[in-house]
Curated annotation (Swiss-Prot):
The protein's name: N-acetyl-gamma-glutamyl-phosphate reductase
Annotated signal sequence range: none
SUPFAM superfamilies attached to this UniProt entry: Glyceraldehyde-3-phosphate dehydrogenase-like, C-terminal domain, NAD(P)-binding Rossmann-fold domains
InterPro entries: AGPR_AS, AGPR_type-1, NAD(P)-bd_dom_sf, NAGSA_dehydrogenase, Semialdehyde_DH_NAD-bd
A molecular function (GO) term: N-acetyl-gamma-glutamyl-phosphate reductase activity
Organism superkingdom: Bacteria
Membership in a protein family: Belongs to the NAGSA dehydrogenase family. Type 1 subfamily.
SMART domains assigned: Semialdhyde_dh (SM00859)
Pathway(s): Amino-acid biosynthesis; L-arginine biosynthesis; N(2)-acetyl-L-ornithine from L-glutamate: step 3/4
Keywords tagged on the record: Amino-acid biosynthesis, Arginine biosynthesis, Cytoplasm, NADP, Oxidoreductase
A Pfam short name: Semialdhyde_dhC_1
Record has Oxidoreductase as a keyword: yes
Length: 364
């Protein structure tokens, strides 16, 4: 079978670059176009020397004319840019937006955290997201919405870690919807590729940790709450039933997110043993190949998942505090962005879900 042709916009950024790295080794895709803005006319050998397969490609302008004509189009653009471009793209192409423009279902949430034009919600690209329960008690998942779709919204990286950590407890009614707290240690690539920001310079970043977007202002908050609502079997319009204290902290590492998410135990949870609570997480991720619930007593570490599409998970209880603590470690560029996007793209095209992906990290 002929390979699917792929165009990547935002090809010289971190997210676009990771998409290119994964797609270059994928057996079913052929990268035939790379597009950018400030780097137009430059060789990819300059920008992505670690991907020698791209050395002969030259960065083209990000226009519909350049992107159309390919089977798959990956948009790794700032929020606002993808939405403006998307309506001009071939309706028969599969378009994956790695940005925020098509993630949120409710315009009120978009207006509060982003502002500007609100674009239509696309099929959400988190296959493992719990979306409710079937009549037999098994979980329904977002995976079922992906086959055949032509438009995919890639989740945020912090959203991915926070959602995967806590959603089993939400789905089974083990945690209260109020007073959820998430503290995330985030690698500097999560802040994007911006040489104008002095806090991203090595002299500023090395040996320093820096909180950012604090006080309920981080733009990933409404997306996390939307996912929590779905995990509880509710609609996005009911996301306001959940409250989240969210603090991301930039740490001196290039990749990785370690999410520590805690929530008050419900009366139901208090009747369960620690082993029974752990069994809830085990059941929730049974058969989800990229989800790794670590052995009891082993906590996730970002160094173990670099370069992989896996999420390393753990859950513990603090009976004195009356809280459940859920942990997730992911590679923010792979599982948190491009890897998850390729996983969703595989499903949309009817390819093996794990094609071109690995759950084996690079360590040390």
């Amino acid at each position: 079978m002929a390979k699917y042709t792929v165009a990547v916009a935002g090809a010289t950024g971190y997210a676009g670059g990771e998409a290119l790295r994964i797609l270059a080794a994928h057996p079913d895709f052929d990268i035939t176009c790379v597009a950018g803005h400030s780097s137009v006319g430059e060789s990819m050998a300059k920008h992505m020397p670690h991907i020698p397969q791209l050395a002969n490609l030259v960065v083209e302008d990000t226009t519909p004319e350049v992107l159309n004509g390919h089977d798959v189009i990956i948009l790794a653009l700032p929020h606002g840019a993808s939405g403006k471009l998307a309506s001009q793209l071939d309706p028969n192409a599969v378009v994956v937006d790695l940005g925020a423009d098509h993630r949120l279902e409710e315009q009120a949430a978009w207006d509060e955290f982003y502002g500007g034009d609100f674009y239509e919600h696309w099929t959400y690209g988190m296959p493992e997201l719990i979306t409710g329960k079937a009549a037999d008690g098994s979980y329904t998942r977002q995976r079922a919405a992906l086959p055949g779709t032509k438009r995919i919204a890639g989740p945020g990286c912090n959203v991915t870690a926070t959602t995967l950590a806590l959603q089993p407890g939400i789905a089974e009614g083990l945690v209260e919807s109020q007073d959820i707290v998430a503290d995330l240690v985030v690698g500097y690539s999560g802040a994007g590729k911006n040489l104008k920001r002095t806090n991203l310079l090595a002299a500023e970043a090395l040996q320093s940790a820096l909180p950012y977007s604090v006080g309920g202002k981080h733009r990933h908050i409404p997306e996390i709450l939307q996912n929590f609502a779905h995990a509880a079997g509710k609609s996005a319009a009911e996301a306001s039933e959940f409250t989240l204290g969210f603090t991301p902290i930039l740490a001196p590492m290039s990749r990785g997110i370690l999410a520590t998410v805690s929530a008050r135990m419900t009366d139901k949870a208090k009747t369960l043993s620690d082993e029974e609570i752990r069994a809830v997480w085990s059941k929730a991720y049974e058969g989800q190949d990229f989800m790794v619930l670590l052995p009891e007593g082993t906590l996730p570490a970002t160094g173990n998942i670099i370069g992989s599409n896996a999420a390393h998970l753990q859950v513990v209880t603090d009976r004195k505090a009356g809280r459940i603590y859920a942990f997730a470690a992911i590679d923010n560029l792979n599982r948190g962005t491009a890897g998850q996007a390729v996983q969703s793209l595989n499903i949309a095209l009817g390819l093996p879900e794990d094609a071109g992906l690995t759950k084996i990290g690079v360590a040390p």
